Structure formats: structure tokens, C-alpha cells
Amino acid sequence: MKRICGSLLLLGLSISAALAAPASRPAAFDYANLSSVDKVALRTMPAVDVAKAKAEDLQRDKRGDIPRFALAIDVDMTPQNSGAWEYTADGQFAVWRQRVRSEKALSLNFGFTDYYMPAGGRLLVYPATQAPAGDRGLISQYDASNNNSARQLWTAVVPGAEAVIEAVIPRDKVGEFKLRLTKVNHDYVGFGPLARRLAAASGEKGVSGSCNIDVVCPEGDGRRDIIRAVGAYSKSGTLACTGSLVNNTANDRKMYFLTAHHCGMGTASTAASIVVYWNYQNSTCRAPNTPASGANGDGSMSQTQSGSTVKATYATSDFTLLELNNAANPAFNLFWAGWDRRDQNYPGAIAIHHPNVAEKRISNSTSPTSFVAWGGGAGTTHLNVQWQPSGGVTEPGSSGSPIYSPEKRVLGQLHGGPSSCSATGTNRSDQYGRVFTSWTGGGAAASRLSDWLDPASTGAQFIDGLDSGGGTPNTPPVANFTSTTSGLTATFTDSSTDSDGSIASRSWNFGDGSTSTATNPSKTYAAAGTYTVTLTVTDNGGATNTKTGSVTVSGGPGAQTYTNDTDVAIPDNATVESPITVSGRTGNGSATTPIQVTIYHTYKSDLKVDLVAPDGTVYNLHNRTGGSAHNIIQTFTKDLSSEAAQRAPGSCG
């Protein structure tokens, strides 16, 4: 009977697979009987007045309005009054298509104010020029998971002036399908790198200032996790800001997205129109203050998410908290940032944002924050952050982006400020509505953060971030290094490994107050002695690991230090060895040879440590003394003058 049940189960799976919609690409690529794209009904939009829009934008900029990149064109298009239906050759699917064109648009996006997709169906939006072997990242797909109580769907941008809207529906469910297109949004600025390339010929580019710093640059090292929390987004297909996923005390990965109240997302209709662009960042580090940094980037806008509901909003501290409609896509590898609601200032701050809603950038401040009211007057609702001359700034489009403490916790979201690449002195600063103020907000769940970010009322003052629950967890790297010395100079070789990625950055501390980020640095010490050296490595997933070792340098002629920094575990009642290879020496050892020993162990009185030469001579260093004290971190001096160079000490056991 088990075999029979198995056969029935396989049959059921086979039927289910046969009724699933085709792959996420235009149906005509898989069904030759469907009309070619050039035969699909075309609707051309009325001309838009771009000159008027740009004149309006000058006034919008003066008022500090959030950036506009598109003009909305009102339409009323449904499958009942537009486009045409066809059936796939196998008779299983009905396919409805409509081409839409708006002359000179740099990109298009669409607002559907009545959307319902039955199970097994899908909606595609793609460039009219899409080819079977073309970039699949330009195709946006929506299905039943995008159904929502507002019955709205707003799409990601499609580069170019002409796009195809395509619905593929199981034939027996066509009656359930609902679609009403009411907004065609004409991009006249250049939203995204592909649209900006189309704009380049006319000199229009929606790029950010050259002083900004790409998140892939070294300034992002150690912050790779919080970088993944930040996304750019569009509102109603025409305006744009920045926001961030935030964690809550339940650690349940609710899709809470924090942004600015002034971005206008505080109503049900505008919240439903959000389209978030995740991991939209340049692939290389463009040196700040170079032409490349101020030019078009290469960030991908293929990782998108549509729709949300409002949880809370409060004008005084300029926050809006949304809950995005859909769970995180594991492939996006998102991060939920922690937060800090304490009533205090901080010694510095970090901003991650989308200036001009272009590729993601990072700004750093090493100046203490201060309390201000919005606009810079006396008050405590906002944090004032002073940017360094070379630490990046924010720009229009950065609004709503998070400001982080040095511990990588959200302290607030960007309200605004005078900062820009050309700003100097105190004008190179910004103001952020504080999480502290927003926590109690206006005194009700709809105007404060506490109900949502601390649902069980734990009273937590701060929490750390939470990584994605999907995909393959990032395995932390293993830090390791070796060293050699010559006189007062030590040369270090990084031998760290990362099993599921690569080492992205290194931070050395040489034990005398000096540091380095080089891969294999050399260090010349001012005086002879033994120094504790630490290496902290960060992998490409943001995980870190630290290795601590020691190095002994001597000012004497020809002095050389040999080490073995490989960690060795010490089991109970066991003998272990840590071999040290000595080569390239002549003559005998010194009568005052220093031997640095570093052993981390509870109760040093349990330990016996010997130095054993290759000829078997044993030099005792430590013999079960020290009582209840822990660890042996000590330099011993031994007379090794009887040891010839080729018979130098071989191991420490």
C-alpha cells in the first residue's frame, strides 16, 4: 500500500506542476502560437510637459520637498476595454497583453488600483524590447502573493519609453482575475542606472554628488549587515525616499520599515503604493571626489518589493513606520537593524542612504551628536549630526534613511538639513528625528513606536539587529596570522580563511597603539619587547573574527623571533606540543634567550610547560605553580648557549 500511495502522490504533483503558470518570462517565448510583441495592442500616452515639471522642481527643491522623478498620467484601462486575450497552444492559459508607450520617457511604472490575481496566475511588466536571452532582471513579476486588502499594486520601473503589461491566467480562473490600470508614470529625470543612461545624451542625470562614498568601499567594512537593512523606495510611482527594516523585541522578522513622515507615507493609499528597491548599490568602490563617483553607477534594481500598511506616524519626530506586505525574499539576504531609544548623545554616527535615490552610500561622523529641535533651534526632538570634511553627506532622496550609533543601532531617521557636497563648517550637518522621541510619540499606538518595536512591553532600552532567516547562514571567518622579526621590525602574514566567502577587510592592532588595515603589514617598534598583536577580519557577509598573538622584537644585531601562532586545544590530563621551526641561523643560541608563552587555561597550577630542543634537551619553563590564578602570558629567559643553530629549540610542550 505504501508504494501505491507514493504513486498517487506523484501523480498529484505532476498534475499540479502542469497547471502552474509558465516560467517568469513573456509567454510568447514559450508559446509560438501567441502574437509577436509588435502585434500587441499599443496605447500611446498624451505628451507630458517636461519643461514645466523641471521648473516646478526648482521650487520643490527650495521648499525641501522630496525628489520627484516622474509625472503621473491618468488612465482607465482594464482587460475589458483594452488589450486582447489569446490562449496558449495547449489550451491551459489565457494571456492578456497591452503595450503602453509614453514618448521620451526614461522609464515607466504603473499603478493598478484594482488588483486580484487567482492562484496559478501571474502579471508581468517588461520592456517592449525584451528578448528571450535578455536581462531577466528587467522583468517584474507579480502573483497571488501580491493580493492585499487595498487591492492595489504598484510596479517597479521599466527602463525605456515602451513597456508590455501581460497577464497569464489559468483558463478556468479568468473570471476571478481583476485588473484596473489608473496611473502610467512617466520618468523625466532618470530613475535607476538604465534610465540615467537614456538621459545622458540630454545632460539629465539623477546621480548623487561625487563626495559621497559607496557602501562597498572600505568605510562599509564592519557595517555590511546594517547596509543590507536599507532600501530606496518610490511613492505613488513619482516620488522617492529611503527607509530601513528595523527589528523588534520579539525577533520575529516582521517587515517593519522605518522612514520619514515628511515622505508622505502615512496614509493607507500612499503606503499601498510603495515599491522598495533592495541592495541597490554600486558594484565597485568609486573614489570619493572623483568624476566617477559623481557619474552614473551600475547598481541593479531587480530586487523589489511592493505594498505596505501604516502602523504609526508622527510629525513632531518625523517618523512613519510601515509594515511591508510580503515576507522577505531569502535571495535578498536582508537585515533587520537594531535600535537604541536611550535619552543620550553618542560619540559619532553612521548614515546609510540613497542620495538622489541613486546607488546606496555611507556617511560617517566622528563628532558627538547633539539634541536640537527641527530647524536647529533649542529642543530635544532631533539629533544633530556633523559630517566630516571627507566623510560623505546626505542629499534629497536620503530622507527617511537611518542614522546609526557606533554600535550599529538605529537612533532616528533623516528629516533634513543643509548638508551637501559643497557645504562647509556647521552647514555640513543634518537633523534626524529621534527614536527616543518617537518611542512615546503622540501617546497612541498610531503615533508611537513602542507598541510595534516592543510588542511584549519588555522595557528594552536597545536591541541589536537580526539577520535574515532565509537562505544559507553566513559562516564567520577564521582569523589567523604568522609573523617573523628582524631586529625591531615584525612582518605579519594574514592566513585567515572564510569557508563560504572571502575576507573583505582586516584590522591589525600591534599592541603599541598603532594599527593597520593592510593584508600583510610590517611594523617597526620603537623599543625591544613582547607585544600583544590582534587581527580582526570581516568577511563579505559582515561577520567578524579575532585572533590574538604575540611578537617579541629585539634591538640587538641579528636578533630574530620565531613564532607559532596556531591555536592548540589542551584536553584534560594530556600532553600537547606547539612546534617552532628555526632556520637560517649560524652559531649558538643566546645565554639570555626570551621565550614568550601564551596559554589561556583555568588554573595555571594545572600546567607544566617545557621547552624541548631537537636533541631532546628539556628546559622547564613552568611547573604547576600559581595556585588558582588563570592563564600563562609570560616571557621566560633561558640559557640556550649550548644549542647550536641547527639544533635550536624545536617545540614547547
Swiss-Prot record:
**Biological-process GO terms, alphabetical:** proteolysis
Q: Does the keyword Transport apply?
A: no
Protein's recorded name: Protease 1
Keywords, in A-Z order? Disulfide bond, Hydrolase, Protease, Secreted, Serine protease, Signal, Zymogen
Question: Organism source for this protein?
Answer: Achromobacter lyticus
**Where does this protein have coiled-coil stretches?**
none
The record's subcellular location field reads:
Secreted
Active site, per annotation: 262 (charge relay system), 318 (charge relay system), 399 (charge relay system)
EC no. given is 3.4.21.50
Q: Family, per the entry?
A: Belongs to the peptidase S1 family.
Lineage here is: Bacteria, Pseudomonadati, Pseudomonadota, Betaproteobacteria, Burkholderiales
Report the InterPro entries cross-referenced here. Galactose-bd-like_sf, Ig-like_fold, Lysyl_endo-pept, P_dom, Peptidase_S1_PA, Peptidase_S1_PA_chymotrypsin, PKD/Chitinase_dom, PKD_dom
The signal peptide stretch is 1-20
Propiece residue ranges: 21-205, 474-653
Ranges of residues in domain P/Homo B: 555-653
Query: What Gene Ontology terms describe where this protein resides (cellular component)?
Result: extracellular region
Q: Which domain of life is it from?
A: Bacteria
